[in-house]
Amino acid sequence: MSESLRIIFAGTPDFAARHLDALLSSGHNVVGVFTQPDRPAGRGKKLMPSPVKVLAEEKGLPVFQPVSLRPQENQQLVADLQADVMVVVAYGLILPKAVLEMPRLGCINVHGSLLPRWRGAAPIQRSLWAGDAETGVTIMQMDVGLDTGDMLYKLSCPITAEDTSGTLYDKLAELGPQGLITTLKQLADGTAKPEVQDETLVTYAEKLSKEEARIDWSLSAAQLERCIRAFNPWPMSWVEIEGQPVKVWKASVIDTATNAAPGTILEANKQGIQVATGDGILNLLSLQPAGKKAMSAQDLLNSRREWFVPGNRLV
């Protein structure tokens, strides 16, 4: 095989842990793992380690959890490992210029989009919401900008009409490690061919918010259906009914014109709850009232039919 590289891995969530797992099976030497500090989680707010930390400790790897890499003493942790390359996957901390320049081959990042489209924090969700036909992963050389570095390798996959952010996340978590291992081989062999990003094609994937997930009935039915898939499983699209949030898990588009005001309930039956939008009709198929499990529209109508009287408006 190619030269075995000394690698520092930096990542935090499950998506990153899958890449670390692939690295550990690749024959390269992972000399240290950086991940975010343990965070309170669950009802008891008990401190919980990240998925990357759990895996790293299982494998007996040195783990470092600085709050920031700006202090000199934390940068020294990186320098002391004398790595050939640092692999960064959903780490969540900014790498200062000094850190980016420490490894012999620099730092590379696995990003969940086909750059330069969807730089930023939420590329998977934004690609779905925008109605993109495909997405993928880009392995890039990191610089001080936000996802602005030269592209080293790309792998693409189609976005289907059934994909949610959850299913797309899983697809990219399979593609990412493949692209990463290939890129490391090219770096070790000296065959990598960096490609500068075309700044005229840049779009930004801004971070999601719970308020943004509130359904805006003035949008088209097609936009809302994509939004529902893009925000599943987090933060989940929702509508307020009698003062409480009701999450919408699944919906379909009925391509029929209506003169009813956006948000007007048109029908509520075993086929779903049909609501007028800014363009077309959205058919709500699976919903989740606060404190309950997700259920079909039919099951919700059996217990809460008064919520969905035709002619009433959802706001």
Swiss-Prot record:
Superkingdom of the source species: Bacteria
Stored CDD domains: FMT_core_Met-tRNA-FMT_N, Met_tRNA_FMT_C
Catalytic activity, reaction form: L-methionyl-tRNA(fMet) + (6R)-10-formyltetrahydrofolate = N-formyl-L-methionyl-tRNA(fMet) + (6S)-5,6,7,8-tetrahydrofolate + H(+)
Transmembrane annotation, as ranges: none
EC number annotated for this UniProt entry: 2.1.2.9
Domains as described in the record: Composed of an N- and a C-terminal domain. The N-terminal domain carries the tetrahydrofolate (THF)-binding site and the C-terminal domain is presumably involved in positioning the Met-tRNA substrate for the formylation reaction.
Functional description taken from the UniProt entry: Attaches a formyl group to the free amino group of methionyl-tRNA(fMet). The formyl group appears to play a dual role in the initiator identity of N-formylmethionyl-tRNA by promoting its recognition by IF2 and preventing the misappropriation of this tRNA by the elongation apparatus.
Protein name: Methionyl-tRNA formyltransferase
Provenance organism: Escherichia coli O157:H7
Species lineage: Bacteria, Pseudomonadati, Pseudomonadota, Gammaproteobacteria, Enterobacterales
